[in-house]
């Protein structure tokens, strides 16, 4: 330690705000790595699903044709957005998505999984990871070194997931038929276990993120009354948003509806921040809107596949998904038929 301090004494002093910017960039990079790992694992799963369906060979070719340059651009853009996004707005995005996800799962099938959620939660997952790191490292003496270690670990996991994704896209068909590759044989046996694994991992991630989000928001308030003035309109706004979006999703579950939902969510959050927030929060909301739209655009083919998969499961399991009651005209026709039979 004495030798390190001796050499460090010759280095120029770095201002504190520089280290704050470096820490924000490292947090954003970890959040972007988490989103990319989720994306790669879902891509592997959906690619194998398409290979097993003769009618989806075109989608399999589209998934296989995605270039590494787009993946690098995806990682770089998300890292920049997460580093610029303030922890306050990031915490609000995490809480809003958690409430919406719980509502979607409960209304769908009493806890059933929806494959669309794995892709709709991408930006919220990155916000949650960045927000959790900001809260957990608040006041830490070696904050930058800890974040560098987190970047190294997340980068290693991302590298392995990308390597598996490229391997599956190029050689899975050959190796699964020849049965001599350990990776492809493992995926051939347990590729259906990828969504349950991601589901459990996302539960833990959002549980930690929600706790960190509440703590990050509450640290700006000096009294309970001030916190209540913020949380009361926030709760009302989020509840109304979830109810509205849930009805729209049931009536029109399309790609256009996914983008419309993003604009409605960010618009509601913008109005709320203009009422009880700060001017910096408004800028961060536009950054969040850019990230949400980019994640949906980048996962367009996969979102369409997930939507079709959810619809097929809903049609194949009518008992799990309750059908609507018979229309009024049908009931009136049955009543008229009974009355006619009684008169005869």
Swiss-Prot record:
Signal among keywords: no
Spans traversing the lipid bilayer: 29-49, 75-95, 117-137, 139-159, 197-217, 230-246, 257-277, 282-302
Membrane topology value: Multi-pass membrane protein
Compositional bias of kind Basic and acidic residues: 329-344
Pfam families, A to Z: TMEM82
Entry annotated with the keyword RNA-binding: no
GO cellular component: membrane
Keywords, ordered alphabetically: Membrane, Transmembrane, Transmembrane helix
Compartment(s) of residence: Membrane
Superkingdom as given in the UniProt entry: Eukaryota
InterPro entries: TMEM82
Chain intervals for the UniProt region annotation (Disordered): 317-344
Leader peptide range in chain numbering: none
Family (UniProt): Belongs to the TMEM82 family.
Official protein name in the record: Transmembrane protein 82
Species, as recorded: Xenopus tropicalis (Western clawed frog)
């Amino acid at each position: 330690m004495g030798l390190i301090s001796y050499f460090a004494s010759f280095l120029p002093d770095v201002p504190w705000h520089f280290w704050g910017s470096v820490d924000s960039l490292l947090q954003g990079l970890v959040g972007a790595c988490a989103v990319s790992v989720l994306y790669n694992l879902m891509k592997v799963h959906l690619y194998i699903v398409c290979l097993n369906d003769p009618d989806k060979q075109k989608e399999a070719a589209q998934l296989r044709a995605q270039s590494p340059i787009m993946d690098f651009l995806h990682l770089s853009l998300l890292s920049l957005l997460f580093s610029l996004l303030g922890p306050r707005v990031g915490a609000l995005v995490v809480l809003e998505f958690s409430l919406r996800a719980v509502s979607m799962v409960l209304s769908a099938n009493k806890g059933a999984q929806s494959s669309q959620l794995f892709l709709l939660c991408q930006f919220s997952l990155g916000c949650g990871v960045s927000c959790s790191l900001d809260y957990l490292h608040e006041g830490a003496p070696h904050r930058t070194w800890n974040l560098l270690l987190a970047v190294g670990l997340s980068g290693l996991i991302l590298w392995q997931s990308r390597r598996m994704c490229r391997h599956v896209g190029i050689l899975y068909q050959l190796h699964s038929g020849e049965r001599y590759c350990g990776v492809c044989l493992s995926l051939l046996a347990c590729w259906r276990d990828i969504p349950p694994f991601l589901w459990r991992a996302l539960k833990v991630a959002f549980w930690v993120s929600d706790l960190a989000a509440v703590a990050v928001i509450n640290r700006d308030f000096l009294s309970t009354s001030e916190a209540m003035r913020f949380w009361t309109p926030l709760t009302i706004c989020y509840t109304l948003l979830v109810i509205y979006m849930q009805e729209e999703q049931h009536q029109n579950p399309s790609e256009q509806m996914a983008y419309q939902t993003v604009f409605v969510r960010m618009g509601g959050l913008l109005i709320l921040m203009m009422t009880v927030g700060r001017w910096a929060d408004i800028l961060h909301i536009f950054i969040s809107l850019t990230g949400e739209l980019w994640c949906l655009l980048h996962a367009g083919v996969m979102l369409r596949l997930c939507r079709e998969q959810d619809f097929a499961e809903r049609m194949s399991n009518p008992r799990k998904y309750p059908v609507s009651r018979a229309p009024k005209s049908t009931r009136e026709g049955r009543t008229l038929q009974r009355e006619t039979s009684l008169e005869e």
